[in-house]
Amino acid sequence: MNLEIIGQIILATFLGSLIGFEREIKKKGAGLQTFSLISLASCLFTLISFELINLFIEKGQGFDPTRIIQAMAIGIGFVGAGVIFRQGEEVVGLTTAATLLATSAVGVAVGAKLYLLAVFSTFLTLFVLAGFGWLEKKFF
């Protein structure tokens, strides 16, 4: 394992924690730990898929790394479903579930060495959570 991989894992965890911190201070169902771990795991799965490509190429076999990313998205869907609840007529947790999916994508971006995309997406996610939440309360 080289230092770049360690840096990727740390960056993914840090970016996930920024998003998780926002959810934590708003007392949502998933917070700092959950979002940090989602981003970290997504980065790890992406890194592993790239390593598997190299391993399979050496053996003369094909490998499709998008299958691992696809499986992650399905898994995040199950995790996200666990934070969605109905309270009377209101459904709560949809934003947190969607944010879990976005955080997973941030981890994938870091694992794929798309650092600018990962950082930009993290801050755009935070902007949407803060800015759009304010707009919803003010106008809807």
Where do the PLM segments sit?
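C-terminal halves and exits of single transmembrane alpha-helices
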Residues: 77-87, 106-113, 117-119
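Hydrophobic, membrane-facing alpha-helical anchors
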Residues: 12-16, 66-82
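Hydrophobic alpha-helical membrane segments
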Residues: 74-78, 95-100
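Small-residue-rich segments of transmembrane alpha-helices in multi-pass membrane proteins
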Residues: 37-47, 71, 98-111
